Amino acid sequence: MAQLKFNSILVVCTGNICRSPIGERLLRKRLPGVKVKSAGVHGLVKHPADATAADVAANHGVSLEGHAGRKLTAEMARNYDLILAMESEHIAQVTAIAPEVRGKTMLFGQWLEQKEIPDPYRKSQDAFEHVYGMLERASQEWAKRLSR
């Protein structure tokens, strides 16, 4: 089996209650042995995952149970080998918090033609389903590339 190039991945979005918890759980499932966590640039500290996000994930066999929102800190960012952000603006915010991590910060949708993953917060269930599909495809692509 090929050796993984990264031992730890941090998934970042805005509030750490919708996109990044799903991305975290999908990558954990696909990359066993890799430490995968999530945080938000404006993290809603200790908040559970958004109810619609949790329902949509559960419908696809992914549990967000036990998730507690975290706010990104510079120290946290430094402690991960790879940081995957949902939007270009998140990359800018991560860089403002910890400039030295810019070189290891990329879009979660990097392998989906560098697509940003839109925020479904307070939108319809269909919006959450669309975002889940993007996160699913992006996590598959990351797992393929990181497992080589």
UniProtKB/Swiss-Prot annotation:
Q: Would the keyword Hydrolase be found if you checked this record's keyword annotation?
A: yes
Annotated SMART domains: LMWPc
Catalytic activity as recorded in UniProt? O-phospho-L-tyrosyl-[protein] + H2O = L-tyrosyl-[protein] + phosphate
Q: Which Gene3D superfamilies match?
A: 3.40.50.2300
Identify which residues the record assigns to the active site.
13 (nucleophile), 19, 119 (proton donor)
The record's section on InterPro entries has: LMW_PTPase (IPR050438), Ptyr_pPase (IPR023485), Ptyr_pPase_sf (IPR036196), Tyr_phospatase_low_mol_wt (IPR017867)
* Pfam families per UniProt: LMWPc
Entry's SUPFAM superfamilies?
Phosphotyrosine protein phosphatases I
TM ranges: none
Q: Which UniProt keywords apply?
A: Hydrolase, Protein phosphatase
What top-tier enzyme class does this entry carry? hydrolase
Enzyme Commission number, as recorded: 3.1.3.48
Instruction: Report a single Gene Ontology molecular function.
Output: protein tyrosine phosphatase activity
* Entry annotated with the keyword Membrane: no
CDD domains under this entry? LMWPTP
Q: Give the protein's function.
A: Dephosphorylates etk.
Q: What protein family does this chain belong to?
A: Belongs to the low molecular weight phosphotyrosine protein phosphatase family.
Please name the NCBIfam families in this protein's record: PRK11391.1
Would you tell me the protein name for this molecule?
A: Low molecular weight protein-tyrosine-phosphatase Etp
Recorded source organism is Escherichia coli (strain K12)
Q: Which gene encodes it?
A: etp
